């Protein structure tokens, strides 16, 4: 397990448009975590949530700066400016460039289902 802590910053809100709002945290390029999608847990203000986290440059939206984006299952509300503790567990796939927003949305939904199942089974 790798732990990343940081303050939530604003993003382009694409995750929200896709039905998976994310909390974004700026990370150092030298963070010793491979780019990809991870099962995770996030602690915010003492509450723990199962989460889906992407570490990388977001090639489908022509991103260039490395970023951690995490979607907290069951969380409602805004996280901007709050400090999060993100615990990365299993890498489920590499980061990849998708040919369309719909293809990206479909893959995120698959990732979500896989992570929920993985975390439910321990």
Which residue stretches match the model-derived regions?
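Phosphate/ribose-recognition catalytic cores of enzymes acting on nucleotide-derived substrates
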Residues: 3-122
